[in-house]
A protein has these predicted regions:
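Long, contiguous binding/interaction regions
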Residues: 1-56, 60-114
Length: 114
């Protein structure tokens, strides 16, 4: 089990430095299947697509993601439809990735394994 599951997202209002690429790769090893991408503004994001058998399962998963996100005070961008859900996570206040993003990713993965 990832040590990230035992942590809580810390409120972030900016003022901290986003992870550099070596920190990102270190933390990426702690969350399975999450891809890293960088947008046109050079901001890093975590990205993962989850596959389901139908719309109802996708919706149930997204509702659970919403509950965890509210509990953690850290909110991903979510796209979903019939048989899939796509989650994108970043720390908007610092325009990059922080430990919060990986904590949330680990907790989202726990929904699937539960």
């Amino acid at each position: 089990m990832s040590d990230l599951l035992n942590k809580k997202c810390a409120p972030c209002k900016g003022g901290i430095i986003p992870f550099d690429i070596s920190q990102i790769h270190k933390y990426q090893k702690k969350v399975d299947g999450w891809d890293i991408f960088k947008d046109k503004n050079e901001i890093f994001f975590l990205n993962k697509k989850f596959i389901f058998d139908n719309f109802s399962e996708s919706q149930k998963f997204i509702n659970n993601v919403g509950k965890i996100s509210e509990d953690e005070g850290h909110h991903p961008d979510i796209t979903f439809g019939w048989g899939y859900a796509k989650i994108i996570i970043t720390t908007h206040a610092i325009k990059g990735l922080s430990e919060n993003d990986f904590i949330l990713a680990a907790k989202i993965d726990q929904i699937i394994s539960a």
